[in-house]
Each structure stands twice: as C-alpha cells, then as structure tokens.
C-alpha cells in the first residue's frame, strides 16, 4: 500500500508475466450498497478493500446494516427499510459514487441528512442530480449550488423527471432510488454519457429481480419493491487491468503478459478498451476468464472516449507509442473526475517529452519518445498509475512520481503488482515533504 509520505521511483524496464487483476471497484461498491439494503445476509467474496469501500461500508452501517469481514469476503446483514434509521450525516470521503448514490437514497427518508466529504470531493459536480431530486419534491439546503456540504431529505412525490446524463452516476443514483421507492417514479436521461456504466447499474438491479420498464433512455419503476440477499464474487477490475496490460503491451519482452480474473461477459465499461486496442492492431487474446497481451505495435486514430472515459490517462500514454497521431474526443466528463484529467495528463506527459495537447473535449497526441522526469499525480489514482506506465517505458532516465497515496483508491497493491510483472517500480521515501512546487 502507498502511504502519504512516499513517492514512487520508476526505471525503464521490460515487463512480462502473469497476475490476477484486483477486484472491481465499481462492482464492489454496488455490491456493498445493495447487500446493505437487502433482506437477510449477503456474502460478497473477493471484495476490493480501499478508502472508497470503507466510505461505503461506514455509510451503510449508519443505515442499519451489520457488517462482518472474514478474509477478503464480507458478510452483510442488510436493513431493507433504512428510511426509519437514516443517519444525521454522511461523510463521503473522496468517493464520487458514494456521494451521488447516497445523496439520492437520502430522499427516501423524511429525516434531514447532512452530506459532506473531503475537500477534494468538492470539485465533483452534484448540481444536476440535486436539480432533478428537487423537481421530485426533495428538500435541499446548501451553501453553494454546486458542491458539498448540503442537507437533504424527502419524501419524494410520484412522478417523472428528466436528468442530465453528463455523468452516468446521476442516472444510476436515480435508478437505485426509484427501484426502492414506495411509489412509482420514472425518468428520462438527457444525452447519456458513459453508457456502459449506467448499464452496469441496471444489470445489477435486474439480477436482484427489480422490475422496471426501459424505452431507450427512459425508465419507469413501479414502486414498492425490495431487494433479497445474495452471494456474489467480485470479478477483476478492467479499469485497473488497463494499466497492467499497458506494461505488457509496450514491453520489448518476447514473453506475454497474462491477466487473470477478467470474465469476458462482464459489463464493465473499460472492457471495451481492450477491443479498441485490438482494432488498432495490438496483439491481444481475449479468453473467457483472462486476457493475454503480447508486445506489439499499434496505430493511433480518432478515438471516441465516451464508453471508457476513465481510461483517458492510460490511453494518452499508449498513444505516445502509437505509429501515428491520435485524437481522443468526447471526453468532457474527464475534466470533473478526481482531477481535470485532460489538463493533468497532458501537463505531466509534456514534462516527459510527450507531444500531448489538450483540446476542447479531449487530447491530440503525436508519437513521442518519453524520458524520465519528476511528475505529479494531481492526487488522482488514474493519473498516477498512467504515469508509472510511462516511466517504465521511458527511453531513458528515471521518473520520480510524487503524491502517490491516491493509488489506494482503486489499486492498493499496485506497486506489488507492477513488480510481479517485472516492472521496476519501487517506493521512494523522501527526507523532506515533496511539495507541489517541487513536483510540478
């Protein structure tokens, strides 16, 4: 695990090997939430334990769930009627999913709940979701119209609302709330982005026997439904797998990199990234439960980022090694993640010699030889791991990557995984705090 006083020192190396991909963050958080709202005891195997998972677990315990951890599994006795023991506040840490999902669920209770979180969470948009909840009757008091903190409570009124699709979590939050509401609710999504991630939420609801009608991007929930307990094993995280895959894809080794625990039928959005790379010429074998990467060259091109917008940082790194220029577009939502990922990855790769330029909704990237440099994560786990891949495949020089504690958000054992694949990534303990001015 990466601690707050450490950076990473990265040297050019030749990765290869075989490894199990860590559990999916998106599935883990949904599994915890749904188990906590179900009748009976649910068992979640192979759960990801990270700061976001702990945020969700703490919130669910406040709603009356009883949680036992046994090894890498969770036994959760749910509270199917959390409306009558709703907590006075939720601290969302730095979790965008917890912020959006629990904000919406709070409107099922008539008791006001304070929604707050870390300073960095204030940059995550919430206004479009609040606007739709207000139209359904939610009572909201806030100091600013765009961020935490605020208080919110219901009840909502039966009806129909239109919600922004600029971030798929808004629609997912409303779908989960409508699924559990005691009255009918329906909504239409305007210009849905990140569609695979919304579909992932609907897949969960369908698997838990929640009934709803869907007409393209309009959904109707009849009301009065509840969740039953379940057993579930969390699959590997395709988003995290993208970084491990990139170690192998860009390697000069003659040996493949094999990533296990990646079921091919899973609905995670970033799974589509691997199909894209195959289309661009990468030598990738997608099997039923694993993916095999062979070092290979590939083309750049015009790439619509919407299906896998979280992959923008690592795809920017990969495109530096493509045979021709690339334009990543339709990625406006990347500006509102843990960092402005468009600006952040361009700025840091430019330090390494990359020809990476922000555009209105993405990046323009020309093939470049990268070199080692002092770079910064911008406190964003995906920026950090993408830069680690860039450092491993730099043509010369070491890379000092600062502020790497953020990696714990989705991949606490990233350094161990990189080393397992023979990537020269190691902890660097500075004798002094690595200030932003030094790293940037």
From Swiss-Prot:
3-phosphoshikimate binds at residues 25-26, 30, 168-169, 310, 337. Its EC number is 2.5.1.19. One of its GO terms (cellular component) is cytoplasm. One of its GO terms (molecular function) is 3-phosphoshikimate 1-carboxyvinyltransferase activity. Pathway: Metabolic intermediate biosynthesis; chorismate biosynthesis; chorismate from D-erythrose 4-phosphate and phosphoenolpyruvate: step 6/7. It catalyses: 3-phosphoshikimate + phosphoenolpyruvate = 5-O-(1-carboxyvinyl)-3-phosphoshikimate + phosphate. Phosphoenolpyruvate binds at residues 25, 96, 124, 169, 341, 382, 409. SUPFAM superfamilies: EPT/RTPC-like. It is an enzyme of class 2 (transferase). InterPro entries: Enolpyruvate_Tfrase_dom (IPR001986), Enolpyruvate_Tfrase_sf (IPR036968), EPSP_synthase (IPR006264), EPSP_synthase_CS (IPR023193), RNA3'P_cycl/enolpyr_Trfase_a/b (IPR013792). It holds the Pfam family EPSP_synthase. Its main location: cytoplasm. The keyword Cell inner membrane does not apply. HAMAP family: EPSP_synth. Monomer. Catalyzes the transfer of the enolpyruvyl moiety of phosphoenolpyruvate (PEP) to the 5-hydroxyl of shikimate-3-phosphate (S3P) to produce enolpyruvyl shikimate-3-phosphate and inorganic phosphate. This is 3-phosphoshikimate 1-carboxyvinyltransferase. It comes from Chlamydia trachomatis serovar L2 (strain ATCC VR-902B / DSM 19102 / 434/Bu). The gene is aroA.
